[in-house]
Design a protein with these regions (language model features):
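GNAT-family acyltransferases
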Residues: 1-114, 129-130, 134-138, 143-150, ...
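Conserved acetyl-CoA pyrophosphate-binding loop and the N-cap/start of the following alpha-helix
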Residues: 114, 118-127
């Protein structure tokens, strides 16, 4: 399956993930303007810190995510609880994995009310097979800061281990706090 021709929708018991839409911007602004959620956002290698307070900023960001999907750079799903956007998940493949299959990077940004172990326990088993299979990645990296206790615990429950040493940005800059899941 080519995720850039047909983006998979992922449904769990309480959540749905689907390709981000422009109409999501208003709901996502509540996520990206949440000061309790902002410390958990991963902006490594990004042109923004994802801390938005105005709708035009969020619309511009969503437009960039959609453009990036259309050009095959990454998939950005909106995470919905019912009809309400409560976060996003992003996945892309880096072709510098040690086994030649590439390495995926998974970002998960959630409103602070959803930054809970039980939410990750629902998201990760649904997302990880797609990340490995549809992106062709032998391993998936995700960032989790030392203060993100429930996220860290959930990563451990779902087979993630701390990445050995620093991960390198595209320009070689070392970045820390990554966890790895192997297929």
């Amino acid at each position: 399956m080519n995720v850039y021709e047909s983006c998979p929708e992922i449904t769990t018991e309480h959540l749905m993930l689907r390709l981000v839409h422009r109409a999501d911007a208003g709901g996502l602004l509540k996520v990206y303007s949440d000061p309790k959620a902002q410390p958990f956002f991963n902006a490594d290698n990004c042109t923004s810190d994802f801390r938005y307070t105005r709708l035009p900023e969020m619309i511009e960001c969503v437009n960039m995510w959609m453009w990036s999907y259309e050009h095959g750079y990454f998939v950005r799903w909106t995470i919905l609880h019912g009809e309400t956007p409560v976060g996003t998940a992003e996945m892309f493949r880096r072709d510098d994995g040690p086994d030649g299959r590439g390495c995926g990077v998974l970002r998960i940004d959630l409103h602070s009310r959803y930054e809970r172990g039980r939410v990750f326990d629902e998201l990760l088993p649904a997302l990880l097979p797609c990340c490995h299979r549809d992106f062709g990645c032998a391993q998936v990296l995700t960032k989790a800061f030392s203060g993100s206790g429930e996220r860290l615990a959930a990563l451990g429950r779902h087979g993630f281990v701390p990445a050995p040493g620093a991960v390198r940005c595209h320009d070689g800059t070392p970045i820390l706090d990554y966890w790895v899941h192997r297929a």
